[in-house]
Swiss-Prot record:
Function: Catalyzes the ATP-dependent phosphorylation of L-homoserine to L-homoserine phosphate.
Gene encoding the protein: thrB
Protein name according to UniProt: Homoserine kinase
Organism of provenance: Leuconostoc citreum (strain KM20)
This protein's UniProt keywords: Amino-acid biosynthesis, ATP-binding, Cytoplasm, Kinase, Nucleotide-binding, Threonine biosynthesis, Transferase
EC number(s) recorded for this UniProt protein: 2.7.1.39
Amino acid sequence: MIKIKVPATSANIGPGFDSLGLALDLFLTLEIHEATTTWQVIHEEPDLPHDITHFIVQAALTLTSNMQPHRLVVKSDIPLARGLGSSSAALLAGLTMANILADLNLSPKEILKQATMLEGHPDNVAPALLGGAISAYYDGHQVYNSSFHIPENIIFTVFIPDYELKTAEARNALPDDFPFKKSIAGSAISNTLIAALANDDWQTAKQLIEKDQFHEQQRHHLVPHLLEIRHIAHQHDVLGTYLSGAGPTVITMAPENEAKILLPALTHLTTSGRTIQCHLNRSGLTITKEE
């Protein structure tokens, strides 16, 4: 049995729209069992198929059709349509499965390029594959990526609402055009945030994480709890609160001691959901073989 384990991811980190992302210690696990005559996908999601039409198998087939079907078991801690990279994790699991079963010998760089091409942007797939926190850009031909350090004591307090928010719906909330001056401001904020994060300048990062210009203001009507959580978090010494990916999940970054205090403060939000705390996953996608 081959086991592929892919972490959840949180994209944007505030102003790093479609470019910044980090991996969290929630996981999708794909187990590849015995060969079969047709694809069998065993999972507990009521609305997903159990055959060749499952997204993981379809992702694998984008690389090659020269694969013997197998019995697959999918287990996931990553909630669907919540802004935590569930589709990116499934995509990478499928591509990695194809790489193994068809002996394609693709490098991680080649897997990343294929995943980014299918996803359209690298901010989820890059940290899911490589682990840690990553800044990345895709020009339509090549993926450029570089990691940056986040200290061990930083905890991610993750509020996951009970409702789904499809990425397409969240994308539709964004304008087709953007004012030039606001674009410059957004770019400058993002650039400075990356430099601050790369240099462990948390005082500067703290002032910039909540200054996004590109998407949070346009999506706040879809995620009213963002401002509510941000207001509560400001009463503690946190680094910042941001919309994870397209939402509706909201994440607050804070040192461990402050995170412990923050958690019970988020128990009575007006939006129903659950709050968990995660660490940065530094290993990314892993493959193990078991007898």
